[in-house]
Each structure stands twice: as structure tokens, then as C-alpha cells.
Amino acid sequence: MPTIASPLPLATTGPENGSSIYDYDYLDDVTVLVCSKDEVLSFGRVFLPVVYSLIFVLGLAGNLLLLVVLLHSVPQRRRMIELYLLNLAVSNLLFVVTMPFWAISVAWHWVFGSFLCKVVSTLYSINFYCGIFFITCMSLDKYLEIVHAQPLHRPKTRFRNLLLIVMVWITALAVSVPEMVFVKVHQTLDGVWHCYADFGGHATIWKLYLRFQMNLLGFLFPLLAMIFFYSRIGCVLVRLRPPGQGRALRMAAALVVVFFLLWFPYNLTLFLHSLLDLHVFGNCKISHRLDYMLQVTESLAFSHCCFTPVLYAFSSHSFRQYLKAVLSVVLRRHQAPGTAHAPPCSHSESSRVTAQEDVVSMNDLGERQADISLNKGEIGNN
């Protein structure tokens, strides 16, 4: 099962990385507390496969739709927000394709061999972090466009943003190194195979490190960045009072609130698990409760790949226009076979329609801010 510190090590497994941390048995040499976790394991074998299957189906459908719209309807020279969404969709797709492996592993055991153990664990970890990082990048992009009125299509600006995308993938790969190094298949005494990270005699230290890494890189730093970026965006919206100001403010608040609601319970549970391992507090009753909490909050956090892309995509007025164009083509093909090859509305038509409507999103406001900045510069030069 996809958990940082070896999910269900005695019955089911998952990556012991910095993204999800199950340690149901607490049987490390340095651990004093030893509790029976049969009830927790039984609950996980029923609850987690169902949740992972739902995440797989919903995440696959939503992100494939997002990917199709971005690849086929968005103009070839995409804005940075659309490139971030494109990378987010790819990352989420790679993440959700690992869910069936973990669902089978939790319900039964690992049956996919040593090679897929490493591949699936590494894919899980890399794209777990990439999803969070690209969400943060999108808030940075809106901040630069709206607050600093950064021109959208300057070569230097575009190059820096593309470099940021590359750095996101490299950073996610770097924090996933433990998956590549330590994860392997293990056979129990009764001949059952599991896939999880074996840290040897330093298991507790590694688990604490990976949990705190998740707390900082996967939650606290992105949350603080989003709060800062959207607070500044809100100040600009209040000062300029553009059309649709209220909707844009609500959208900015919703993006931060959704991120917090999805990720805070999970990260709090990971932090409490770390305190338990450090013997700050703990007994078997608390240990059991934390194990149940971890299964539920982890599932809530994983659902981000189903809902977040939709929320971000539909905050863009232009994306809604692209989606309408795709759906209209699909409906025409379904209703009238003779018009199956009728072309969708052109990019120029779509752009004109978008430009004629009121600005009601942060994305559109960012474009207007950049245009205003360029016009001021031209006037100053004259």
C-alpha cells in the first residue's frame, strides 16, 4: 500500500517513502511498544482497496479529459498556466495508475515481482510530490501575472517558467531516491510476498526523516506559499475592482481551503505518528486510533488527484471555452455521423469569444494586468 513507512508490513505493503507512512506493527528493534494490529489490518484490507479503486477510476477519467482538452483544443502556444495543468494531469495519471497495484497488494499480497515493486513505488513517490509542487507553481504563476503584471509571452519569462517545470520533476525525483534504493520485495515465513522499503537497522530514523520531509515539502511550505500568493492576489483584486472581483476572490480562497482540507488531516496524523515513534506519548489504544486515522486521512489526501485538476481548470474562463469546443465536436459526431469530420471552432474564434465576455477569473485578470503593464511601458517610451 502506498504509505511512507511501509503500509501493512505484515499483511499488505506499500512504499516506505516520504509520501505515506504506515507502520502498523511497530516492530523495530528500538521500539518498546508492541501492539496487536489484527483489527487494523482487517479494516485496511476492506476499506483501502475500495478507496484506491475509486481514486483510480475518477482520477483516470478526470485527468484524461483534462489532458485531451489541453492537447487538442488549447492553442499550440500555450500559456504557462496551461503547461502547469498539462504537467499536473500527466503527474496525476502516473500517480493513479499505481492505485490498482496497491489495492491488490493490500487485499492480498504483492504478486507483481521485484522489478514492478521498484517501478510502481518510484512512480508513486515522484508523482505524489509533483502533484503538490505543480499546484504551488500555478499559484506562483497567477501571483506573477496579477501582482507583478509579468508579460505572458516574453522569451525570458517563458524560459524561466519552463526551467521551473524541469526543476519540479528533478526535485520530485530527488526526494524519491529512497524508493529506488531501499524498496524491494520481501517474503514472509509463510511464503507471502510484500513490497516495501527495508531500511535495516536505521528504520526509525528513516521513517522520521521521510515523515518530516512530507510535512515540510508536501504540506507546510506549499501551504505558506499559496497563502502568500493568493493573499497578494486578493489585495490587487480589492484595489483594482475588476469585473467578477467577487468570484475571483472566492476562487482564490477556495483553492487554499481545498488544499488545506485535503492535506492537513493526513499531515497531522503523520506528525502524531512520529511523536508516537519518539515515545513522546503512546499506548496501544492511541496507536490503534492513529492507524485508523492514517488510512482515512491518506485516502482523503489521495483524492486530490481527482478534484484539484477540475477545480483549477474550471477557474480558467478560456479552459471552459476549450472544453465546450471539445464537447460540441463529440456531440456532433454522436448525433450526426455525416458531420464526424466537422472541425471544431478555430483557436481565433475561441479567443474572440473569450475576449468578448466579462473577465471573471484570475487567469483572465492576469492577462489583462500584463497587457496594462506593456501598454504603460510603451507610453513611457513614447
UniProtKB/Swiss-Prot annotation:
Sites where a glycan is attached: N17
Residue ranges, Cytoplasmic side: 71-92, 141-162, 239-250, 315-382
InterPro entries: CCR1-9-like, Chemokine_rcpt, CXCR4/ACKR2, GPCR_Rhodpsn, GPCR_Rhodpsn_7TM
Record bears the keyword Oxidoreductase: no
Biological process annotations from GO: calcium-mediated signaling; cell chemotaxis; immune response; inflammatory response; positive regulation of cytosolic calcium ion concentration; signal transduction
Membrane topology listed for this record: Multi-pass membrane protein
Extracellular side: 1-49, 114-118, 184-217, 272-293
Disulfide cysteine pairs (residue numbers): C117-C195
GO cellular component, one term: recycling endosome
Subcellular location: Early endosome; Recycling endosome; Cell membrane
Region (C-terminal cytoplasmic tail): 327-382
CDD domains, per the entry: 7tmA_ACKR2_D6 (cd15188)
Keyword Transmembrane: yes
Tissues in which the protein is found: Predominantly expressed in spleen.
UniProt entry keywords in alphabetical sequence: Cell membrane, Disulfide bond, Endosome, G-protein coupled receptor, Glycoprotein, Inflammatory response, Membrane, Phosphoprotein, Receptor, Transducer, Transmembrane, Transmembrane helix
Main location: other
Record PTM: Phosphorylated on serine residues in the C-terminal cytoplasmic tail.
TM helices/strands, residue ranges: 50-70, 93-113, 119-140, 163-183, 218-238, 251-271, 294-314
MF GO annotations: C-C chemokine binding; C-C chemokine receptor activity; chemokine receptor activity; scavenger receptor activity
Family under the similarity heading: Belongs to the G-protein coupled receptor 1 family. Atypical chemokine receptor subfamily.
Domains as described in the record: The C-terminal cytoplasmic tail controls its phosphorylation, stability, intracellular trafficking itinerary, and chemokine scavenging properties.
Protein's job: Atypical chemokine receptor that controls chemokine levels and localization via high-affinity chemokine binding that is uncoupled from classic ligand-driven signal transduction cascades, resulting instead in chemokine sequestration, degradation, or transcytosis. Also known as interceptor (internalizing receptor) or chemokine-scavenging receptor or chemokine decoy receptor. Acts as a receptor for chemokines including CCL2, CCL3, CCL3L1, CCL4, CCL5, CCL7, CCL8, CCL11, CCL13, CCL17, CCL22, CCL23, CCL24, SCYA2/MCP-1, SCY3/MIP-1-alpha, SCYA5/RANTES and SCYA7/MCP-3.
Protein name: Atypical chemokine receptor 2
Source lineage: Eukaryota, Metazoa, Chordata, Craniata, Vertebrata
Gene that produces this protein: Ackr2
